[in-house]
Amino acid sequence: VGTTVHYPRNTCAPMECGVVIAEHLPGDEGYDVLSNFMGPFSLHAVMAMALKVAGNKLRHRVPRDSGGSFGVKQAVFPYVVMMCLASRKAGAPVKWVEDRLEHLSAATSATARLTHIEAAVTPEGRILALRYDQADEVGAYLRAPEPATFYRMHGALTGPYAIDNLSVRNRVVVTNKTPTGLVRGFGGPQVYYALERLMDRVAVALAIDPVELRLRNFVPSDAFPYTAAAGAVLDSGDYTRLAMMAIAEADVHQLRERQAAARAAGKLYGIGVAAIVEPSVS
């Protein structure tokens, strides 16, 4: 059973746009920067190399509070480098404040992905293998830390399911759009949108309830710690019990009644289910 899905670009609009204040320190041949860049340590080495200085020659400070980010402000780092160079040229501190139009026009967006995904399935609904063919549209060029959208989730491509066999093909496509980057759990939505759509397709093909299909494929509670096919270590859990708690809390019977009434009135009313596992660290 297979399906092809397209996950579109999407982004966030934090209340506070990007801000950088940079000062060249001529005696030190270093730089002092204050910005609302999200996670300055993560790309500190990249910025230092771009400026052709040792890491200890670039001091990068961030305020304790920032008006939102959701990953988008990771893309402030190119402007940090540019403002450092502008400060060196001007011989004075330089401040850059991104306005809303700039942000909406050119800020980072989540990576668009085209995925073809297939499952080898027994007649009883046990999934034996998965095959992913993923193509990420990353804009005009790869900008650090891309293609991390692929690899943050790579170890967990089988989700919460006990699937022993996995084949993966990843490709990057460049276009004439702005570069992509980190947005809200980057890599996770792209993977699970495809995987959970496939689970629903399998359920339809075998005439099995979507919840029951997932229950048949969850990693058993006595199998933890469980090493997934692509390497993720799932340390603990009871996915079946958790799913049953969610079903009970959702009152599916009442949802079905609402669905029937809505459809009788000519309205669309869907009931969705998804099971995901997110890495605890990036």
Task: Describe these PLM feature segments.
Residues 1-282:
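Structural alpha/beta core scaffold segments of enzyme domains
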